Amino acid sequence: TRQYEESKRSTFYDYNDLFPSLNATYKLNEKQQFRLAYGKSVNRPEFRELSTSVYYDFDLGSDVMGNSGLKAAYIQNVDLRYEWYPDNGEQISVALFYKHFKNPIEWTYTMSGGTDPIYSYINAKGADNYGIEVDIRKNLDFIGMKNFSLSFNGALIKSKVQFAAGTNNIDRPMQGQSPYLINTGLFYNNTEKGWN
């Protein structure tokens, strides 16, 4: 067993934020359009990220301590999308996206008196994510699968975090950010019988 220090300190956090968004659509014809979207969002620290209590993380195999000085991360999103609707219930879209993070929350670690690191959280200076996304939904009637449709979504993502000068972290991709995402699904929808 291991003895951990107990803290009775409490902290109050107060946030007053506005999150504007804008969506604009330009129709090329009845089946094709461009869509431009902007939005601002927030990623507030979780309780475990703020708590100065030390706990053992079995996945890391190490102690983890929160950081009560963490700030909320603010994200600005821009998305330019081309959409085509070839048939009822079908869609093909291609999007370019960009996200800028202010104060993103990232992992860091320090070496304790022994040789085991203690992991914690810090606010990086900023981060940028950008990439391309493809979204397809196709009815499968043409191969005899009436009422079935197949969906596919894939994205390629480039990510980079910038840390403040003087830290022991180097610029790298965001922690936990995959360089690609792939999703697919098979759907059944029978409006006559009310099944889906």
How should these model regions be labeled?
Residues 1, 31, 41-45, 87-89, ...:
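Structural signature of outer-membrane beta-barrel domains
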Residues 1, 21, 25, 33-35, ...:
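Residue-level detector of the transmembrane beta-barrel scaffold of outer-membrane proteins
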Residues 1-29, 55:
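Signature of Gram-negative outer-membrane beta-barrel scaffolds
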Residues 2-8, 47-53, 60-62, 104-112, ...:
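Outer-membrane beta-barrel translocator domains and adjoining extracellular loop/strand segments
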Residues 13-15, 19, 29-31, 59, ...:
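Outer-membrane beta-barrel porins/channels
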Residues 24-28, 40, 84, 138-140, ...:
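Residue-level signature of outer-membrane beta-barrel architecture
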Residues 42-93, 98-101, 112-139, 175-180:
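Outer-membrane beta-barrel signature, preferentially recognizing the C-terminal barrel domain
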Residues 97-100, 118-196:
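Gram-negative outer-membrane beta-barrel transporters
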